Amino acid sequence: MDVPHGADDEQAARWNAPVGHAWAEMQPVLDGMFQPLEGLLLDAVTTTHGGHVLDVGCGTGGTTLALARRLGPQGHCVGIDISEPLITVARARAEQEGTPASFIQADAESHVFEPAAFDAVISRFGVMFFHDSARALANLRSAVRDEARLRFVVWRSAEENPFMTTAERAAAPLLPDLPARRQGGPGQFAFADPDTVHHLLAGSGWAQIHIRPVDADCTLPTSELVRYFTRLGPLGQVLPDADEQSRARVVKTVRAAFDPFVQGPEVRFTAACWLVDARAGAHTPT
């Protein structure tokens, strides 16, 4: 495992503490929610090419394993994530289903990959959390062969994704200590500006860059909604320390705020994303 330093420590601490365990616990719900995006990533790597594929920010391995199943014996998939709780789940899933994928617990920004080891890189919401995105994208470029394909999905703006901010907006008046999103830093909407993404990729050794909007219709069971917003996101960080009365008031208020998204047994929302494609340029940046 890489040992992160400086600002990288913050992400390592975050994803190896209760946040990481919460995401591991919610794995079935999250995999179901984001299943509509899975095909977009898998289509980037066809069975006719096979080869070695890297899944960045792989979490509990859902996309990595799906791709490994599609490629079969002619390919090999490697997932990398900074979170030990998530990688532990991913490895257990691979072993349980007998899928030949492997997983690395490390920070993809600083991990020393074998040069030109991969034929493609994919990521589902895994590239927005780097401390230094340019450094991370250059490191990924060094890990792939020339002309290798990069495809990732990232969130567009918070304004275009009201479902994702409903909980914190509803809870903010009741929780003065609720962590605010940091503008310009690592986080869910760090790649919301397509011009910034294009600039980062072009400066990190990637070419043939294409960025297009994708709106995915996502769902989760209504029965999982309260667990979803109390375990994940800003509320998941502060509610464990709240007294019972405050917690009940927050849960009631936030649950009501989600009513526009609830349709009987399902919660439905649109994930407004960017689908980003690029090819590794002929020369690794120095």
Question: How would you describe each model-predicted region?
Answer:
Residues 119-133, 156:
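A short SAM/SAH-binding and catalytic strip from SAM-dependent methyltransferases
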Residues 71, 94, 171, 201, ...:
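Conserved hydrophobic residues forming the short capping helix/wall of the S-adenosyl-L-methionine
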Residues 52-111, 135:
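Class I SAM-dependent methyltransferase SAM/SAH-binding core
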